[in-house]
């Protein structure tokens, strides 16, 4: 009995540290990109997955101590997939005292009617879902739309575009929507997926599976995700450094003539970003730049096992 109590205390200690880390990361992203302003009404897109649950809880937590006042409204799109547990989110949100709206649209039927059997449905489904969420944001008077993409999603998107799209394009923490009417924010932009996964498991959120539509998995994204997870295990700090690189772009040392005026370089031009080192190799640090191991990672890794043992 005493051993179980000690494990429970350790779990709570680790959970508190994890929550503080997520709060810190979300708060920093909000500050860096001016995501939330005085009087904002944030539409939090809630899918029933670990990311959106975590985003909602951290935003509610920050709301209590934020220097600006803002409101939150959770929105879920019920696309009428067979077997969708439509009672889960309303019950959870009412229990938490969160303002919410469930939007019911049979996009599943439209997609099944338009897309031949065996073909991936993700593209059409995504367009339909996006349009409905934009419309809902307008109806609710939302000034910002919050999505639950995290740091790993952003890096995956960067590599997907590099490997398959031939462009260096990631997923922005904040940007105007494609219809030009809404500001989309990603408060989890600085958060690690493994932190979110641990937090969601400890919180025991009522997770809704994401495979209800029966669509084919995005194999390209899966390959990229596996690659990044492998790197994270084999080369600690690499993921953090790659994300830092997205925040430290040097256009003069790339090849995009739209970003830098290569044609305008003449004798007497200013030396930019250290200039060209010619035959000298770039001075690369032995350890990933700016990376420091999280002191409590090993303890957090034990948290999942501890929770299982207590139960």
From Swiss-Prot:
Residues annotated for [4Fe-4S] cluster binding in this entry: 122, 125, 213
E.C. number(s) listed in UniProt: 2.8.1.-
Pathway: tRNA modification
Pfam families xref list: ATP_bind_3
MF GO annotations: 4 iron, 4 sulfur cluster binding; ATP binding; magnesium ion binding; sulfurtransferase activity; tRNA binding
Top-level taxon in the UniProt lineage: Bacteria
Subcellular location(s) per record: Cytoplasm
Chief location category: cytoplasm
Locus of motif PP-loop motif: 47-52
Xref: InterPro entries: Rossmann-like_a/b/a_fold, TilS/TtcA_N, tRNA_Cyd_32_2_STrfase, tRNA_thiolation_TtcA_Ctu1
Cofactors demanded by this protein: Mg(2+); [4Fe-4S] cluster
Catalyzed reactions: cytidine(32) in tRNA + S-sulfanyl-L-cysteinyl-[cysteine desulfurase] + AH2 + ATP = 2-thiocytidine(32) in tRNA + L-cysteinyl-[cysteine desulfurase] + A + AMP + diphosphate + H(+)
Entry's cofactor comment: Binds 1 [4Fe-4S] cluster per subunit. The cluster is chelated by three Cys residues, the fourth Fe has a free coordination site that may bind a sulfur atom transferred from the persulfide of IscS.
Key words, A-Z: 4Fe-4S, ATP-binding, Cytoplasm, Iron, Iron-sulfur, Magnesium, Metal-binding, Nucleotide-binding, RNA-binding, Transferase, tRNA processing, tRNA-binding
GO biological process entries: tRNA thio-modification
Any one GO CC term of the record: cytoplasm
Miscellaneous comment in the UniProt entry for this protein: The thiolation reaction likely consists of two steps: a first activation step by ATP to form an adenylated intermediate of the target base of tRNA, and a second nucleophilic substitution step of the sulfur (S) atom supplied by the hydrosulfide attached to the Fe-S cluster.
Record note on quaternary structure: Homodimer.
Protein family membership: Belongs to the TtcA family.
Alphabetical list of PANTHER family matching this protein: AMINOTRAN_5 DOMAIN-CONTAINING PROTEIN, SULFURTRANSFERASE-RELATED
NCBIfam families per record: PRK10696.1
Function of the molecule: Catalyzes the ATP-dependent 2-thiolation of cytidine in position 32 of tRNA, to form 2-thiocytidine (s(2)C32). The sulfur atoms are provided by the cysteine/cysteine desulfurase (IscS) system.
Name of this chain's protein: tRNA-cytidine(32) 2-sulfurtransferase
């Amino acid at each position: 009995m005493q051993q179980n109590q000690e494990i429970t205390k350790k779990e709570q200690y680790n959970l508190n540290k994890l929550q503080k880390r997520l709060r810190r990361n979300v708060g920093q992203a909000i500050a860096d990109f001016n995501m939330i302003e005085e009087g904002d009404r944030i539409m939090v897109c809630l899918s029933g997955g670990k990311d959106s649950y975590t985003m909602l809880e951290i935003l509610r937590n920050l709301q209590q101590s934020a220097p600006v006042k803002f409101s939150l409204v959770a929105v879920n799109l019920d696309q009428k997939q067979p077997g969708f547990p439509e009672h889960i989110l309303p019950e959870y949100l009412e229990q938490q005292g969160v303002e919410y709206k469930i939007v019911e649209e049979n996009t599943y039927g439209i997609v099944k009617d338009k897309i031949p059997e065996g073909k991936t449905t993700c593209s059409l489904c995504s367009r339909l879902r996006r349009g409905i969420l934009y419309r809902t944001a307008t109806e609710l008077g939302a000034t910002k739309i919050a999505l639950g993409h995290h740091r790993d999603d952003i890096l995956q998107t960067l590599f997907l575009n590099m490997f398959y799209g031939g462009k260096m394009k990631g997923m922005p923490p904040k940007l105007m929507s494609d219809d030009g009417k809404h500001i989309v924010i990603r408060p989890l932009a600085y958060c690690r997926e493994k932190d979110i996964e641990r937090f969601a498991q400890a919180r025991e959120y009522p997770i809704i599976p994401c495979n209800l539509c029966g669509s084919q998995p995005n194999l390209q994204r899966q390959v990229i995700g596996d690659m990044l997870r492998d790197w994270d295990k084999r080369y600690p700090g690499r993921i953090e450094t790659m994300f830092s690189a997205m925040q430290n772009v040097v256009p003069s040392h790339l090849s995009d003539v739209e970003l830098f005026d290569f044609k305008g370089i003449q004798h007497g031009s200013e030396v930019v970003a250290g200039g060209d080192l010619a035959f000298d190799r770039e001075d690369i640090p032995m350890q990933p730049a700016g990376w420091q191991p999280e002191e409590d990672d090993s303890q957090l890794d034990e948290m999942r096992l501890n929770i299982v043992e207590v139960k």
